[in-house]
Amino acid sequence: MPTKNQLIRHGREEKQRTDRTRASDQCPQKQGVCLRVSTRTPKKPNSALRKIAKVRLSNRHDIFAHIPGEGHNSQEHSIVLVRGGRVKDSPGVKSHRIRGVKDLLGIPDRRKGRSKYGAERPKSK
């Protein structure tokens, strides 16, 4: 426990906060190149095959990004746009890929939540 005099002379050192957005450099989106596309099983008690991709961002950071929605046309060397947002049951996956931008196509025939999946507006009858 420091004395008052020691605190006046030196003060207290502030704790360094860990940066949650280290890979994105404080940017809302970042462009990257797909290195590998694979599936991963989630933590307990969930069960699925989550589609993920290893992406090298334009600032040379390698990250894992989740591919949302049903089905995708993603493969190695495709150019993608990545946003933040973790997948709670997949450790190490802290970002999402944006559908309907660059090489990752939107979901065809999707009617609800279209903006999240890059889907076109359906033709009215």
Swiss-Prot record:
BP GO terms, sorted: translation
GO CC term (a single one): ribosome
Transmembrane segments: none
GO molecular function: structural constituent of ribosome
Subcellular location(s) per record: Mitochondrion
Stretches with biased composition (Basic and acidic residues): 10-23
Region Disordered, annotated ranges: 1-29, 105-125
Entry keyword Magnesium: no
UniProt-listed InterPro entries: NA-bd_OB-fold, Ribosomal_uS12, Ribosomal_uS12_bac
NCBIfam families: rpsL_bact
PANTHER family: 30S RIBOSOMAL PROTEIN S12 FAMILY MEMBER
Function: Protein S12 is involved in the translation initiation step.
Protein name as catalogued: Small ribosomal subunit protein uS12m
Organism in which the protein naturally occurs: Oryza sativa subsp. japonica (Rice)
Gene: RPS12
